[in-house]
């Protein structure tokens, strides 16, 4: 039986690359389009209650988190609520959740790579928001 894989945020560059590379290996993704106003706790609840994938890759706000020049604190707050709900839903439905991380959760003073075992020390609003996500 094949795993049901869901990709939130399939419209961004990384999402498109995953879909393309997956297709080359005969890996298909459920890639739902977000609501007009973006994913929120209610729409995520409905989506996961209806689809129940085995694993979910969350790139829903990838552009805002990693590429956009300016993102307001209000946008980050709304995204944080959505990601918290997504994590709760995945835990409740026993869905594996993959969430990209970022170097921005560290202070950047090291010359070598950081690992998930390092103590986070985010700088700026974006780094602090990413650490909470």
Whereabouts are the PLM-identified features?
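Adenosine-cofactor binding site in Rossmann-like domains, unifying the SAM/SAH pocket
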Residues: 23, 27-47
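Glycine/Thr-rich phosphate-binding loops of Rossmann-like dinucleotide-binding domains
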Residues: 15, 65-66, 106-108
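N-terminal Rossmann NAD(P)H-binding glycine-rich loop of SDR-like oxidoreductase domains
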Residues: 2-24
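NAD(P)H-binding glycine-rich loop region in Rossmannoid oxidoreductase-like domains
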Residues: 41-80, 89-91
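Active-site Tyr-X1-5-Lys
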Residues: 121-133
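SDR active-site strand-loop-helix element
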Residues: 8, 56-62, 97-103
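Conserved Rossmann-fold NAD(P)-dependent oxidoreductase catalytic core, especially the SDR/UDP-sugar
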Residues: 84-123
């Amino acid at each position: 039986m094949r795993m049901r894989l869901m990709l939130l945020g399939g419209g961004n560059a990384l999402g498109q690359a995953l879909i393309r590379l997956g297709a080359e290996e005969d890996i298909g993704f459920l890639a739902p389009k977000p609501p007009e106003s973006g994913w929120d706790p209610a729409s995520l609840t409905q989506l996961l209650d209806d689809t129940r994938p085995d694993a979910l890759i969350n790139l829903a706000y990838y552009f805002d988190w990693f590429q956009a020049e300016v993102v307001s604190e209000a946008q980050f707050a709304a995204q944080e609520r959505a990601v918290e709900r997504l994590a709760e839903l995945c835990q409740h439905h026993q869905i594996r959740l993959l969430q990209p991380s970022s170097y921005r959760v560290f202070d950047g003073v090291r010359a070598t790579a950081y690992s998930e075992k390092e103590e986070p020390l985010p700088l700026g609003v974006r780094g602090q928001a990413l650490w909470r996500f």
